[in-house]
Regions:
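Zinc-dependent metallohydrolase catalytic domains
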Residues: 3-158
């Protein structure tokens, strides 16, 4: 009985957190309304599994990156650790953003939004990183900045 209750409680907590990601990605306007066409919004429910994977991957990847730097004896907060003028943390997140950089036509944006279980690259970066506190620290993001999201609105699943 106790384990069933624990499983049910865990499932409810997971569903609540997952719904938070659904709402965040569904709130993104992919394409504005045009003529008789309504605005095209992200489909957070359809892309949920991949959005959760991106969140978990970012967290695990960043932890692994920091651990590898420490094992090499690198002080990631030192001036000597700068990479082309960026801190190691900044370089990590910039590389994530570069991975998903794309230039696509509106019709392809529409096709991908409707038929692909992955969010568009821009949203994989911008929505995901707004849930990652170390990203805020790396770039000094604060209230009022475009990428700011209050801690109580950040979704942390894994």
């Amino acid at each position: 009985v106790g384990s069933e209750m624990c499983i049910r409680d865990s499932a409810e907590k997971f569903a609540k957190l997952a719904n938070g990601l659904v709402e965040q990605f569904s709130a993104v306007e992919i394409m504005p309304a045009s003529g008789s066409q309504p605005a095209l919004m992200g489909n957070g429910q359809y892309t949920l599994g991949e959005n959760i994977a991106d969140q978990g991957g970012l967290r695990i990847g960043y932890t692994a990156f920091l651990n590898s730097q420490r094992k090499k004896g690198v002080d990631v907060d030192s001036q000597e650790a700068l990479i082309d003028g960026f801190t190691p943390a900044q370089a990590f997140y910039l590389n994530f953003a570069n991975l998903w950089a794309q230039n696509i036509r509106p019709e392809e944006m529409r096709r991908l939004t409707v038929g692909d279980v992955h969010s568009l690259g821009e949203n994989r970066v911008n929505v995901s990183l707004r849930n990652i506190a170390p990203f805020f620290k790396a770039f000094g993001i604060k209230q009022g900045d475009k990428m700011w999201r209050p801690a109580e609105e950040q979704v942390i699943i894994w």
